[in-house]
Amino acid sequence: MKILWITSVYPSSMKPGEGVFHETQVQELQKLGLDITVICPRPFHSAPVRMLKKTYRKKDVRPEYEIRKGIPVYRPFYRAVPGQLKWAQPHRRIASAVLKTMKQRDLYPDLIHAHFAMPSGGAAAVVSESAQIPYVLTLHGSDVNVYPHYSKGAFKAFKRAVGSASVVLAVSHKLQEEAKKLSGFDSSVLPIGIQLSRFQGNEETKEEIRKRLGLPLDQRLAVYVGRLVREKGIFELSEAIESLQDSPKAVFVGDGPAKSTLTQKGHIVTGQVPNHQVRDYLLAADLFVLPSYSEGMPTVVIEALALRVPVICTDVGGVSSLFGKHQHLLIKPKSAQALAEAITRYEHEQIWKPEVADDLYETVQAQFDAGKNAKALHHQYQTVTKTSV
């Protein structure tokens, strides 16, 4: 079976940490014998637009084509305009780039799988209609919780992407409920998961891992992993750490526009690290903190729980369904005070009890095995292709 993935994020040789969760699922599908091709369209701004903003002038260094871990990945350009997800939906321009690539590269998939309703899902709807190929859509978070609320045009694009798909999948129950409320259409819950074998056992001690990573041996560490952008709650975390008299040292693992600001404040900022090294930083942590304003089902939280690392996380997206009966441990977003109080409680009241760690570990083992979930996805593919004949 030939499957064409359309997504706005996928790892590359130049940015191996971008969209790793997609590659995890593709690798598991490949093990099942599926022939996967990825098209990851990238925006290109015209000369007049590039004059408006420095970020628009930044050159995209990702290769136009590469074979990545046995998977062909194409990155055609499409014309982008400022604020396009609000006022000038890009799905038709993206679809044109996808259709052109399909024609040039003789791609004839049996099925399309689009990730994120906006913009990839909207593009998939156009490609599906033009090429007469059915598509599956996976909803991840911001495509439901954020983008449809931008404007009437954005909402219309969201509803079309969801309504035109043969099957709609959501990475959490919370997302499933919100998508139903917004669009009126049903979906099934299917998380991507993680490769659990990578998170079993550890031969090194925490001290040995910290030595290898160059981290302090004599301080408590609160570790954050992700993009260094405001929407991830990093400034609230910084403020919370600074407000505590006996605070842990903050370690920000990742890159982004806030890197220099966080470094100037005296925090440890590692920059982008290879994906396989994220596990080491989690194991080096006394606390893992993810204070995002919005999420779908954050992979790094699942990874931390698989390693039994204490987690402080905001109550956003599907995290509450992941935490289940322990969701009272989640905190409200955009609050440095809530973060400071949570850190204090974790460190001095020992609210992260062994039974909490055990329960959440078992949840991850049962529901977030990437291999098992890929088999369920394969079944969805088979159902769609059979019914569309």
UniProtKB/Swiss-Prot annotation:
UniProt-listed Pfam families: Glyco_transf_4, Glycos_transf_1
CDD domains documented for this protein: GT4_WlbH-like (cd03798)
One annotated GO biological process: cell wall organization
Record keyword rRNA-binding present: no
Pathway: Cell wall biogenesis; teichuronic acid biosynthesis
GO molecular function term, any single one: glycosyltransferase activity
EC identifiers of the protein: 2.4.-.-
Induction: By phosphate starvation, via the PhoP/PhoR two-component regulatory system.
Keywords: Cell wall biogenesis/degradation, Glycosyltransferase, Stress response, Transferase
Enzymatic class: transferase
Tree of life domain: Bacteria
Secretion signal, residue range per the UniProt entry: none
Homology family: Belongs to the glycosyltransferase group 1 family. Glycosyltransferase 4 subfamily.
Extra facts: The nature of the anionic polymer present in the cell wall of B.subtilis depends on phosphate availability. Under phosphate-replete growth conditions teichoic acids are present, whereas under phosphate-depleted conditions, at least part of the wall teichoic acid is replaced with teichuronic acid, a non-phosphate containing anionic polymer. The synthesis of teichuronic acid is accompanied by degradation of teichoic acid and reutilization of liberated phosphate for other cellular processes such as nucleic acid synthesis.
Protein name: Putative teichuronic acid biosynthesis glycosyltransferase TuaC
Organism name: Bacillus subtilis (strain 168)
Name of the gene encoding the protein in the UniProt record: tuaC
